[in-house]
């Protein structure tokens, strides 16, 4: 690799601790090759959505939308709000429209672009939900924490949704260690 080469790295499906171990090795190799990331890069995480029912879909979208202002705080400025063409905000979509959707197709119609922080269009092709907000990184710590955050949010969405205006310290699906990690990220990225 030299400084003129750009590429997109796509992993195979990774699952559980074994998947995280493989990811850690890849991050180590990328770092040892002096791979550099810039503001045009994004980390896109696909999570299995094959077994989602409509309640889980609605709760997930409402939770992400209601948490978006807090999530924005621990993302770089280039990934906040609607500042990035490739990961649009969910804020402008009315809660009632999300709640009234009867199936995934209706939700996909409400969120027709794949260039959203939460991409529902991925479901039709891959049976996944894609999260596009995170900035590009080769830091295993950042990726692991983000994947765990998303996994816990999805698990929570199977039973409920976050209320509007919720603060990071009140996210019920995060443990104290992960809350501390994101508080430190927020402080580091404060504008």
Where are these predicted regions, by residue range?
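C-terminal accessory/tail domains of diverse enzymes
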Residues: 1-37, 50-191
